[in-house]
């Protein structure tokens, strides 16, 4: 699929959206589908925009459940919901990570569908801000929250992996202890993987070369992945080092297939990691669930980093697409890869058949009258190329997917069950646009 044929394929597979969610007045910047049993017995959608509005949506009624307005109306970059404690982490462009707790005394019944009349009210759930801390957000990177391996019975403990406060090429790892006082520790400060790789002469990387800022984080099992501005992807896990008698970062993955282009997004599915950039392909890495135990390591105790002496650059498989400048990716079931480009196009790609099955766009419909004697209406561009579509398609600010799921019918009336099954039986692609709308599309 190359050249003009790409345009024919994309136009032929254009698909209308099934639903539109309207509440945001500014561009959507973050989307995530989560399970929140304390709020709903079906998945809910989280959305954020560039004016500091966070919204939790009921996907059955297509209405907001609750919202938060970030002080200063700061651009929301990413969020993370911790289901076990009803705590929400929101990272904003003002370089602050704010942590909110959902007041348990005002939560909805777990059987939300019996209270559909409440679904259009956004003030019946109360959020309490319990902490805030500075994080470097120069790069618009997201962050990772993971449960500690050994929580205690008296409190819950989590790791926060994020950009270092000052150096956007390095990371910090915090330990968050959620008890009556909410404690915060920083066992890892300024972990510098680029410096380590250059010291070890990995790939013959010049000591003067720059990895650039960290663009994205992803997590697969116990491995955290960092995508850099220069196209490198680094994966590590936290392991206990007998010699130092403390935890250190162990490198288990290095790849550079997008070099020198920046990593724009990453996602995981099963034991696979997917990454994208300004190229016209997606890379797919198969990550072993149980990594082999090693006996020989390269290490720098000052940096608190080690890697197996056998570590080599990972060889991926590539999925070539009729789009480039791919800003968002997600995986649905086993076969479908969903990608959004800077042009405003989102495609559903069947990896088994190597075909584009659906294309979603939201057009600005800027119609102009041609001076030609033939007299036609156009969208203001005489070109059918992907690059020209940037001017007449709304940009995609965020994209995520929801896979079909099973429904527990206990206690549901027939009408309620029908509405939930209509959502549950399908796979969905949810796209947030720069005009503040969120489109729901059946896959």
Swiss-Prot record:
GO biological process, one term: chromatin organization
WD repeat residue intervals: 23-67, 71-110, 258-295, 318-359
Skewed-composition ranges (Low complexity): 378-391
InterPro entries for this protein: WD40/YVTN_repeat-like_dom_sf (IPR015943), WD40_repeat_dom_sf (IPR036322)
GO annotations of cellular component type: nucleus; TTT Hsp90 cochaperone complex
Keyword Transcription regulation in annotation: no
Keyword vocabulary terms for this entry: Chromatin regulator, Nucleus, Repeat, WD repeat
SUPFAM superfamilies (alphabetical): WD40 repeat-like
Residue numbers spanned by region Disordered: 372-391
Location relative to the cell: Nucleus
Keyword Ribosomal protein on entry: no
Signal peptide start-end: none
Described function: Component of the ASTRA complex involved in chromatin remodeling.
Similarity comment: Belongs to the WD repeat ASA1 family.
Subunit composition and interactions: Component of the ASTRA chromatin-remodeling machinery complex composed of at least ASA1, RVB1, RVB2, TRA1, TEL2, TT1 and TTI2.
The protein's name: ASTRA-associated protein 1
Organism: Saccharomyces cerevisiae (strain ATCC 204508 / S288c) (Baker's yeast)
């Amino acid at each position: 699929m190359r050249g003009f044929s790409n345009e024919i394929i994309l136009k032929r597979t254009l698909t209308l959206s099934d639903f539109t969610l309207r509440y945001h007045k500014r561009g959507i910047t973050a989307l995530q589908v989560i399970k929140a049993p304390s709020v709903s017995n079906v998945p809910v959608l989280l959305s954020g925009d560039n004016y500091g509005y966070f919204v939790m949506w009921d996907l059955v009624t297509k209405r907001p459940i609750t919202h938060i307005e970030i002080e200063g109306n700061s651009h929301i970059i990413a969020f993370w919901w911790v289901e076990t404690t009803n705590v929400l982490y929101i990272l904003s462009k003002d370089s602050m990570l704010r942590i909110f707790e959902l007041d348990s005394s005002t939560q909805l019944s777990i059987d939300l569908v019996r209270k559909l009349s409440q679904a259009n009210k956004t003030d019946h759930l109360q959020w309490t801000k319990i902490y805030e801390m500075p994080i470097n957000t120069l790069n618009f990177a997201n962050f990772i929250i993971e449960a500690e391996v050994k929580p205690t019975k008296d409190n819950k403990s989590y790791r926060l992996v994020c950009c270092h406060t000052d150096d956007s090429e390095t990371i910090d790892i915090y330990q968050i202890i959620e008890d009556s006082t909410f404690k915060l520790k920083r066992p890892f400060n300024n972990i510098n993987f680029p410096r380590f790789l250059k010291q070890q002469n990995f790939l013959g990387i010049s000591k003067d070369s720059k990895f650039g800022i960290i663009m994205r984080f992803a997590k697969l099992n116990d491995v955290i992945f960092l995508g850099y501005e220069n196209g490198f992807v680094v994966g590590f896990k936290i392991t206990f080092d007998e010699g130092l008698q403390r935890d250190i970062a162990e490198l288990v993955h290095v790849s550079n297939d997008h070099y020198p282009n920046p990593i724009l997004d990453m996602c995981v599915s099963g034991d696979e990691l997917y990454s994208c950039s300004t190229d016209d392909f997606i890379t797919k890495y198969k990550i072993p669930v149980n990594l082999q135990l090693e006996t020989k390591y390269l290490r720098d105790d000052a940096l608190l980093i080690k890697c197996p002496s056998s570590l080599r650059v990972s060889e991926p498989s590539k999925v070539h697409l009729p789009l480039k400048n791919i800003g968002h990716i997600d995986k649905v079931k086993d076969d479908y890869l969903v990608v959004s480009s800077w042009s405003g196009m989102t495609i559903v790609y069947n990896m088994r058949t190597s075909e584009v099955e659906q294309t979603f766009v939201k057009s600005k419909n800027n119609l102009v009258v041609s001076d030609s004697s033939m007299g036609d209406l156009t969208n203001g561009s005489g070109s059918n190329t992907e690059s020209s579509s940037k001017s007449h398609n709304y940009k995609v600010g965020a994209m995520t997917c929801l896979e079909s799921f099973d429904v527990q019918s206990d206690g549901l009336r027939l009408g309620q069950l029908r509405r939930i099954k209509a959502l549950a039986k399908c796979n969905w692609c949810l796209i947030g646009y720069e005009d503040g709308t969120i489109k729901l599309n059946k896959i």
